[in-house]
Amino acid sequence: MRFPIQCYDDFYKDPELVRNYALQLPYGSKGGVYPGLRTAELGEYDQNFHNATTFKFLSLCDDFDQPEYEVLVETYFQKIWRFSKDKDDPLNVGWVHADTNTVLAGLVYLTPE
């Protein structure tokens, strides 16, 4: 199955509330090869938030609210700092990579700027 690249504005109704929630959670750098710090899987903190985010994300692609679908979804908050103080520096453009054994991935920016 192939999914198109999409950009969806205003994913959360109240992104500032979600951002404040995210900033209150503990972060660490356990395993993985990724920049910055990451929370534990969000379902460990709030299963309802995890489910609502997951179903909203999947609904952008299809009607995944049908009982015959079974999906394994991991959700995290991640803090990543700029690699350069100059926000236009090419070092801050991104980190191209491939997630192994992943069919679909997404991200939501909660940066206020």
Put a short name on every predicted segment.
Residues 1-113:
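Fe(II)/2-oxoglutarate oxygenase catalytic core
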